[in-house]
Swiss-Prot record:
Keywords: Membrane, NAD, NADP, Plastoquinone, Quinone, Thylakoid, Translocase, Transport. This is NAD(P)H-quinone oxidoreductase subunit O. Its EC number is 7.1.1.-. Disulfide bonds: none annotated.
Amino acid sequence: MAIKKGDLVKVVAEKLANSLEALASDHRYPPYLFEGRGEVVDIRGDYAQIKFPVPTPTVWLRLDQLEVAQ
């Protein structure tokens, strides 16, 4: 299923590990990144901007690192 704007998504930890994005940032990921669901607020190319239900900035992740939450 293709991810689109407004979808609720989960981050796939295995796909994020050792990716370029993971190597460029702190490896101590906050728990909400994998335990919660985020909302896709924008999509540009292969990346989606995700807003989580906690008071933090949005994050950009590759679409293949995300899955639609059930």
